[in-house]
């Protein structure tokens, strides 16, 4: 059986073929950053919905009013979810250069922007609510996901999420003469 891959070009091929209903463009701009911008924009026309999570409106969020487009002929519903800049939120980042950093929040976030993690938690809570109310298909992965471990109170916690991903001690442990709490 052929496996489905999730590489950039394969995802957009499936969009062109009408095999994907939606896409979240999270902090990226596929309308102009892929190998074929016209194909990417045409693929987005075939989606039912597009979530553009970014600092500002960009070519992806506004693909429907791009060159040669007739907005009345494009049915894709676009949702703009404004997120914070990297200096306004705490958390880790990684890139294709294979380096990682932990950043602490600097200035207060601007306006109604939110950290990516807060957006993800709000979406997951809303999806869970729908699954419970509407008897969603295959509910175990959705309802069983331990998002409470991602949170501190009612907000997303990058530190707690890092612990979930990397592991942590449940009690004080000394290894090689170093105490871990």
Model-derived regions: residue spans:
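Non-catalytic alpha/beta scaffold blocks inside enzyme catalytic domains
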Residues: 1-166, 171
């Amino acid at each position: 059986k052929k496996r489905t891959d999730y590489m950039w070009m394969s995802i957009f091929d499936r969009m062109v073929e009408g095999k994907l209903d939606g896409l979240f463009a999270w902090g990226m701009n596929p309308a102009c950053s892929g190998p074929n911008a016209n194909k990417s924009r045409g693929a987005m026309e075939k989606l039912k919905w597009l979530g553009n999570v970014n600092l500002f409106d960009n070519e992806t969020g506004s693909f429907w009013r791009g060159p040669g487009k007739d907005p009345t002929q494009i049915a894709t519903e676009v949702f703009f979810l404004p997120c914070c800049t990297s200096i306004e939120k705490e958390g880790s980042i990684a890139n294709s250069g294979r380096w990682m950093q932990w950043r602490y929040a600097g200035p207060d976030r601007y306006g109604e922007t939110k950290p990516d993690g807060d957006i993800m938690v709000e979406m997951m809570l809303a999806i869970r609510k729908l699954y419970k109310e509407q008897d969603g298909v295959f509910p175990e992965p959705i309802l069983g996901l331990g998002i409470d471990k991602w949170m501190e109170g009612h907000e997303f916690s990058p530190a707690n999420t890092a612990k979930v991903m990397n592991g942590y001690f449940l009690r004080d442990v000394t290894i090689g003469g170093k105490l871990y709490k």
